[in-house]
């Protein structure tokens, strides 16, 4: 496996969410699907995709909405925990989350208006 390089998201065209600890870009506002989620540390946002993260091994986890298989995500810049990606949802009503990403609001620097 080769070296991974950070992706820089163009802030002139999009509102960028970044890691509060190191400033690494993680996602843009146009990739946000919902602000109505709960993470390990409180409020969380659901995104269609993110960049500059490392994925952990898949793990089964009981969550507020049932049992899921998830991969924890860490920031590529500082290795801080930032959220998780949904690999599998066992409940049919939760399957829309598969492939989507949760980012913890407590670790995000949000776009400034």
Task: Name the predicted role of every residue range.
Residues 1-113:
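N-terminal pre-domain and mature-chain start segments
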């Amino acid at each position: 496996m080769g070296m991974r390089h950070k992706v820089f998201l163009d802030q002139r065209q999009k509102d960028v969410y970044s890691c509060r600890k190191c400033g690494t870009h993680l996602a843009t506002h146009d990739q946000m699907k919902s602000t109505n989620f709960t993470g390990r540390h409180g409020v969380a946002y659901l995104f269609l995709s993110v960049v500059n993260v490392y994925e952990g091994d898949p793990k089964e986890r009981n969550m507020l909405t049932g049992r899921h298989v998830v991969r924890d995500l860490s920031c590529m810049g500082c290795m801080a925990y930032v959220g998780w990606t949904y690999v599998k949802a066992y409940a049919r009503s939760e399957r829309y989350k598969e492939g989507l990403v949760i980012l913890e609001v407590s670790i995000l620097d949000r776009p400034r208006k």
